[in-house]
């Protein structure tokens, strides 16, 4: 909560979304209530569990969260991390709950026809007010081109102007510029694939003097030595450092 309060204190008019995922529903609800009381504009919830969850269990989790708070909730569909795969039908049932405002979906195919078909198929199950946000920064431009409403960006947390160049171009229909801006960041995307976005961004923040070198919660470990030097090299090449 200290991190959230610090973020809110410095965010100004920028909305802050708080992650509330936890292994137990009681902890999810406690985090949700604390974040709402602190003033978070939205809540991001992934169905995290040591044991594989059923669709009914995941639905019940989101139902409980929507009952406990009024703050808008974003469904975090991240099968790589959670080992749970949402069906479109389950997304539709959850989206009908009060408070559900958005779904953060996994990266889409680079094939524009396949990507657009995937977005269209999912939208067919959702109320009009529920937005779709793409994740996976390297392929985010494909999601925007396919009709996603936004991009839940790793990069945007530390380099918002860079992410905005892509989203603004996509928002005006200038996909050529959006693709070009994304392609320019290919060295950064390669770092994400190699080390993981959280480690790269933590390293970048440390290089910028925003946090300590070892700022990640254990068991996560930061980048050091040649890895840290490579991140610095890429950021300088992109004029981000």
Regions found by a protein language model. Name each.
Residues 1, 28, 119, 140, ...:
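A general structural signal for well-ordered alpha-helical segments in protein cores
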Residues 4, 35, 65, 103, ...:
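Conserved, mostly hydrophobic/aromatic
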Residues 47-56, 171-174, 216-220:
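Glycine-rich tight-turn/loop motif centered on a GG-T
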Residues 67, 79-193:
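Catalytic alpha/beta core domains of metabolic enzymes, predominantly
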Residues 144-148, 184-218:
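Conserved short secondary-structure transition element at the edge of the structured enzyme core
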Residues 210-241:
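Flexible C-terminal active-site loop/helix
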């Amino acid at each position: 909560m200290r991190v959230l309060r610090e973020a809110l204190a410095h965010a100004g008019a920028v909305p802050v979304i708080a992650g509330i995922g936890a292994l137990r529903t009681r902890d999810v609800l406690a985090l949700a209530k604390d974040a709402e009381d602190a003033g978070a504009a939205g809540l991001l919830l992934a169905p995290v569990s040591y044991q594989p969850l059923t669709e009914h269990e995941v639905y019940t989790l989101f139902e409980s969260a929507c009952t406990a708070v009024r703050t808008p909730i974003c469904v975090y569909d991240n099968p790589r991390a959670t080992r749970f795969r949402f069906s479109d039908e389950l997304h539709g049932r959850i989206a009908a709950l009060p408070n559900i405002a958005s779904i953060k979906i996994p990266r889409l195919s680079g094939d524009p026809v396949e990507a657009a078909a995937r977005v269209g198929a999912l939208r067919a199950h959702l109320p009009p007010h529920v937005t779709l946000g793409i994740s996976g920064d390297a392929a985010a431009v494909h999601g925007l081109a396919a009709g996603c409403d936004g991009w839940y960006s790793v990069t945007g947390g530390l380099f918002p102007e860079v992410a905005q160049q892509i989203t603004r171009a996509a928002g005006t229909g200038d996909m050529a510029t959006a693709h070009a801006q994304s392609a320019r960041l290919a060295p950064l995307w390669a770092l994400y694939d190699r080390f993981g976005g959280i480690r790269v961004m933590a390293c970048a923040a440390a290089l910028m003097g925003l946090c300590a070198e070892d700022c990640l919660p254990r068991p996560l470990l930061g980048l050091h030595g040649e890895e840290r030097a490579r991140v610095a090299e890429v950021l300088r090449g992109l004029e981000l450092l």
